[in-house]
Each structure stands twice: as structure tokens, then as C-alpha cells.
């Protein structure tokens, strides 16, 4: 990937950049991204989950903390805007607890923006290798119309794993076991879940959303089929009592994941059917391919459709759709 890489394709073939140029889709990205990060404007709040687990909201993305006498685990570090407040809150809750391990569920700044504050020198930062790669390079995200610069090296994950590694992987913190694994090409190409088996809690990062359409970051490897597969994988790890922590917002249950899976599979089928007729995103939007889901999933369905098509084209339809 070059430093100034731009992911531009023929708009006559796909009809996507015409929509972007008109501003209809690109203007919506800021609204959806603001909604996804709306928690930055909230006060930090702590909700007890189970067995020493706490959910911290208002820091950007959801943050989960496990505190034990032997050590601590933190999943995600929120946004940079709230990093100092979050670090202070975590320190207050941990007290004199030994050094902790930090997990990053993916690279997005509302989940990794506080890494430097959350992870003093020497703290293990666990993530998929693709997350480290995105955090250490410069790249352009077309749907945001934004360049991302490399993060400071202190923020990079320093304990990464690959898709080929045996999974799930695990660490032990005192008597508590923490399991984690890769969710390939879903929200991004570096998504992971973090599972606390004893508490029956899964932290799903950006692969699960609460009451809004998922963000399909196709520039960094996400696509709708991969997200559907990731959702199925998470469902297989759940029972009726499992708590699933989404990227932002309220805790989800297995039934919520099943609804997300059904929505993703239905929308994918409709996108493929229209694309294989040689038609594009504007036709998909005009036909209202998400209309029965709009009441459940807030946000701009136009952006969701556009990003779903982009990711599907790059992952599966390129070379098939002329």
C-alpha cells in the first residue's frame, strides 16, 4: 500500500463514486461516524457486568475492565479525547492491582485512541497483526475522505497474533481465563473478540452494533459477508444468558446477534442480485433494500448500502460484474 493510496474505481462500472461526488453518501459519513462516536460527549459511566467485569461507557467505544487481586485486563482504550479521564477512572478502580493486559478489538481510533495513556511502557497490548499494521502506516479511507497517519509507536499493539495461529488463544489472570480469536474481514480485517468464559461475557468490538447499522470499513478489509460470518461465529459462542458488549451502546444478547445475522445476509443477497443485473448503488438505495430493517437499525442506510456494496465488490464480485 502506498502512502497516498486512493481506492478509486470506475464509476461507470459500479455507480458508487457518482453518489459520492454528489455528496449524498459522503456527506452522510460524517453523521454516521459522529453517531458512532457520540459517547465522546458523554460523561464516563461504569456498569457492573458479572464476576469482576465492568463496562465503561462515554469514552468513545465501549471499554471493558476485569479487576482481580492478581492482575487486570482492559479491552479497548476509547478515544484520545477521553484518554486521561479514562486512565484516571481505571486507576481508581484497580487501586494497587498489578500490571494489566490491554486488548484492542480493532484499529479504529474510538477503540485505540487511549492506548498510550492506558498502557504504560511494558504493558502487553494484544491485537491481531493487521491491527498493528493499520496503526503503523499512513492510508486513506475513501468513505471518510480522510488520511490516517501512523500512530506513535507506544500506541502500537506489541503482542500480536495471526489468523493461522491455533484459536482461541488465551491468557490467565490469576484464576480468570480470557480467550480471544480473530473475526476475519468483518468490520475491518483485524477484528477480534475477547471472551470471559467464567462470566459468560464476550466483547465484540465493532463486529456487533446496538441499534444502528454496522460500519463496514471496506478500505481496511471489512465486508458484509465477513461480518455475517463473524456474527455467526459469535452466536456459536453464546447461549441465551451470554452478554455481548458491542462497539458502542447497550449490552446485547444472542437474539440481537441473530437479528444482525439475518439482516446482513438479507442485504447481501439483495445487493448481489442487483449488482449481477449490472445496476449500482443508486438502484439499491432507490429500491429500499434495507427498508424493513430501518426501524431497528438507526443511522444512514445509504452509507451502509454503499459500503456494503464496495466491500462485496472488492471481496467477491470484482471480475464478475463488468
Label for each model-derived stretch:
Residues 48, 71-72, 77-81, 132-266, ...:
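Metallo-beta-lactamase
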Residues 12-27:
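N-terminal export leaders
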Residues 69-71, 81-126:
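Active-site metal-binding motif and surrounding structural segment of the metallo-beta-lactamase
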Residues 45-92, 97, 192-196, 200-206:
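Conserved beta-strand hairpin/beta-sheet module of binuclear metal-dependent hydrolase folds
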Residues 1-12:
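N-terminal secretory signal peptides
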Residues 281-322:
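C-terminal regulatory/interaction regions
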Amino acid at each position: 500500500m502506498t502512502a497516498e493510496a486512493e481506492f478509486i474505481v470506475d464509476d461507470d462500472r459500479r455507480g458508487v463514486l457518482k453518489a459520492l461526488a454528489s455528496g449524498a453518501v459522503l456527506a452522510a459519513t460524517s453523521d454516521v461516524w459522529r453517531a458512532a462516536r457520540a459517547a465522546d460527549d458523554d460523561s464516563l459511566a461504569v456498569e457492573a457486568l458479572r464476576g469482576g467485569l465492568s463496562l465503561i461507557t462515554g469514552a468513545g467505544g465501549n471499554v471493558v475492565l476485569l479487576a482481580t487481586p492478581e492482575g487486570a485486563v482492559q479491552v479497548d482504550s476509547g478515544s484520545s479525547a477521553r484518554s486521561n479521564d479514562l486512565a484516571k477512572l481505571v486507576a481508581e478502580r484497580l487501586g494497587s492491582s498489578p500490571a494489566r493486559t490491554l486488548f484492542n478489538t480493532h484499529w479504529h481510533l474510538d477503540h485505540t485512541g487511549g492506548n498510550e495513556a492506558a498502557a504504560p511502557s511494558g504493558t502487553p497490548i494484544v491485537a491481531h497483526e493487521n491491527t498493528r499494521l493499520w496503526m503503523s502506516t499512513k492510508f486513506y479511507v475513501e468513505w471518510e475522505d480522510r488520511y490516517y497517519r501512523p500512530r506513535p509507536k507506544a500506541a502500537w499493539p506489541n503482542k500480536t497474533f495471526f489468523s493461522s495461529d491455533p484459536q482461541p488463544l488465551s491468557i490467565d489472570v490469576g484464576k480468570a481465563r480470557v480467550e480471544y480469536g480473530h473475526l476475519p474481514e468483518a468490520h475491518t480485517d483485524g477484528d477480534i473478540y475477547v471472551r470471559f468464559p467464567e462470566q459468560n461475557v464476550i466483547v465484540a468490538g465493532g463486529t456487533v452494533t446496538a441499534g444502528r447499522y454496522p460500519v463496514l470499513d471496506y478500505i481496511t478489509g471489512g465486508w458484509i459477508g465477513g461480518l455475517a460470518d463473524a456474527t455467526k461465529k459469535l452466536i456459536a459462542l453464546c447461549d441465551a444468558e451470554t452478554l455481548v458488549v458491542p462497539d458502542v451502546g447497550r449490552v446485547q444478547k444472542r437474539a440481537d446477534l441473530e437479528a444482525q445475522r439475518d439482516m446482513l445476509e438479507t442485504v447481501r443477497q439483495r445487493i448481489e442480485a442487483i449488482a449481477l443485473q449490472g445496476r449500482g448503488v443508486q438502484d439499491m438505495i432507490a429500491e429500499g433494500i434495507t427498508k424493513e430493517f430501518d426501524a431497528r437499525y438507526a443511522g444512514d442506510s445509504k452509507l451502509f448500502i454503499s459500503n456494503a456494496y464496495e466491500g462485496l465488490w472488492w471481496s467477491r464480485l470484482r471480475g464478475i460484474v463488468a
